[in-house]
């Protein structure tokens, strides 16, 4: 970019601003920095709760008759993956994972729509539990073949487990299963 052509009257200032934003990013205000630091102080506690809840949900889903398969490192049948999981995640894996519900696309969508505690959102790692049907939302632009290549099927559901009471989370999931 030529700044003398883009902003002839303020080329130097524009160049400095553009380079600073590109190289260093935007600067947050003091208030936002304070809020960020406040959240950082409790991050380890929140992650601990996320992981603890996720492991319980994974076990619940892994034993549920309406679930085809759970994709989480804690339930892998591959001995090599289990060894890596134990080595790198001694306190448990992440709180974001997918599972396949028995049935097709409509079953998966109905399950998601009937959850009450879970929010139907595309973002992840929130304090609240989130659910989404990737094939009809975040990956809707892909063909069925492309989805399958990425391990996303019409019955795949992605969960991001939050910090709510685990009994409430499992009760909500059970309500979703009862609706299908």
Model-derived regions: residue spans:
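PLP-dependent enzyme catalytic core of the Aspartate aminotransferase-like
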Residues: 113, 129-180
